């Protein structure tokens, strides 16, 4: 029995449910979808990676799977986000399709394409490769003409379905149309449908004064309303799984009504789904704060988290559980948790039970970007990596030289950890009291005669042996020196930190001195 068959991981459970309910499928289509109305934030990414994990679980069970990601770039441009330039210039495009709005960053063909490209270029870094479907192209090519006709022919039934979850005060009364129309003159959806001939032709008029009759087979102006569009796509793409946010899965929300429309109008059973919760952000640095108009996207998070560690955050948390992605000291804990899970998965750290081993192993498998690596990563705690980088002013080659026993299959992952650590230290959330710079300017710190004498003793007797003493041995020798002076160990160690980094405290002293090395320590203490 394979690990995915024995697994109790939520992605495997969902995959089992899909197979049970859709046993007759030759191919299992799983879908996600986002409107590129602005930066695709990390909360949107939860939908994409949730689908990816279920896709992987299905494939692990030998199923043929198609992963479709829809860009809803034919949605209307409703408002201008705060973090977008050329605000005044964009006002004229409000109420047009997003794909018709020019890119204010002047990098892509359209505003929509700019935001699509941002996430599309980042997803391969976390091992996600969906098939992209651009809804603007689908509508403009007339792909949905027949499905729009079906909706118009069944508009009264759709109206009844929508009203099923509404109270009397909010029921849709009067004439209802399950479509919106983009005027072919002003290109905005400020239109009113006047008539439908029950064949292919729709009559409308616009606030701009334009009006006309359009043939669904020849126009791209007509678009289905959201809940109808969603149901239609399930049928068109044969979708068997698609998650949705908690707002869509509320009682009587868009999923409930889309499910009925899919069943009764398009004759396709609604896909297996689940509700995913919101993502919080904790300890954001100033450059990423909402007050700075910044929306945190996937690339921002990958500045601090290795791809497999970022995946681990989502893999190890049930989708219906809210959690926060941290940029403060919790970053250290998250890396520690991932490292422990990796050690358990590779049998380096003994699990308490078979169940715990299987859980960690499956979480680790699903966290990997390209499947199981050939060997465990070179495990250096993130905190220690940060310290070594700061000692070497961010020089990753110097850090690699410090760990001479690293295997070639471990280098890529370790270098990425170093890059993330240095990003975090510089300007991505590390608190100031965690940061330091070695004092190698030759300027003396004012010290008492007793402390100065102790530093000289350390320089002359301990520093020459720093590279050969173990951390434990060096620590014992430091305490032995401290016992020889009347002020005690606390004052001596504070003085050492002041001399080395200009602060009253820092990394564990013995290990810190070993990383600095004999030559640099001797040079720094020689001014006393």
Curated annotation (Swiss-Prot):
Acyltransferase keyword on record: no
Motif extent ('KMSKS' region): 287-291
GO molecular function annotations of the record: ATP binding; lysine-tRNA ligase activity; tRNA binding
Catalytic reactions on record: tRNA(Lys) + L-lysine + ATP = L-lysyl-tRNA(Lys) + AMP + diphosphate
Compartment(s) of residence: Cytoplasm
GO biological process, one term: lysyl-tRNA aminoacylation
Keywords: Aminoacyl-tRNA synthetase, ATP-binding, Cytoplasm, Ligase, Nucleotide-binding, Protein biosynthesis
InterPro entries: aa-tRNA-synth_I_codon-bd_sub2, aa-tRNA-synth_I_CS, aa_tRNA-synth_I_cd-bd_sf, Lys-tRNA-ligase, Lys-tRNA-ligase_SC_fold, Rossmann-like_a/b/a_fold
GO cellular component terms attached to this protein's record: cytoplasm
Alphabetized Pfam families for the sequence: tRNA-synt_1f
PROSITE patterns linked: AA_TRNA_LIGASE_I (PS00178)
Listed name of the protein: Lysine--tRNA ligase
Organism, scientific name: Treponema pallidum (strain Nichols)
Organism phylogeny: Bacteria, Pseudomonadati, Spirochaetota, Spirochaetia, Spirochaetales
